[in-house]
Amino acid sequence: MIRLEPVTDTPPAGFDAIRRDARAERYNMLDRLASEWESGEQRFTRPGEALLAAYSENALAGIGGVTVEPAFAGAFRMRRFYVRPPYRRLGIARRLALALLEGLPSANRLVTVNASANRHRAPIGTGAARRSTEREP
């Protein structure tokens, strides 16, 4: 069973292990998360922002967040998503993403992602992303 918990005060239990896994796959997003958290630059505290940890049993299986997108007024950005290899293909990223989307203010649900994340978007029903320089017609 997968349990989602908000991350508010400190990095979640098991963060060092998930960070090592990400680094071993040459992903640096969790190093950036740790650095930004420690400096206070990003704590996911603005209205609509959230960082969620996904646990399988008591093991940290995944993490993901949503922040205010400064490039577009009223928009948000999915970021710092990672699911540990043994827990992939179990719907954890989908659960994280949907929970984060449900927590956004209903007035505006424009969400941006890094273009390299497009292959992960279809399973949650959001389709391919446009480049950040493209605008809706």
Task: Specify the residue positions occupied by each region the protein language model found.
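Active-site rim helix/loop that mediates acceptor-substrate recognition in acyltransferases
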Residues: 27-53
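Conserved N-terminal entry element of GNAT/NAT acetyltransferase domains
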Residues: 1-17
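Conserved catalytic-core motifs of GNAT/GCN5-like acyltransferases
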Residues: 112-114, 127-137
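Conserved beta-strand in the GNAT
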Residues: 53, 59-68, 77, 82
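Short coil/loop residues immediately preceding or within conserved phosphate-binding loops
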Residues: 48-49, 73, 78
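Hydrophobic alpha-helical core bundles mediating ligand binding, dimerization, or RNAP-core interactions
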Residues: 15-26
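Conserved beta-strand-loop-alpha-helix junction that forms the acyl-donor binding cleft
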Residues: 88, 111-125
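Conserved acetyl-CoA-binding loop-helix of GNAT-fold acetyltransferases
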Residues: 83, 89-102
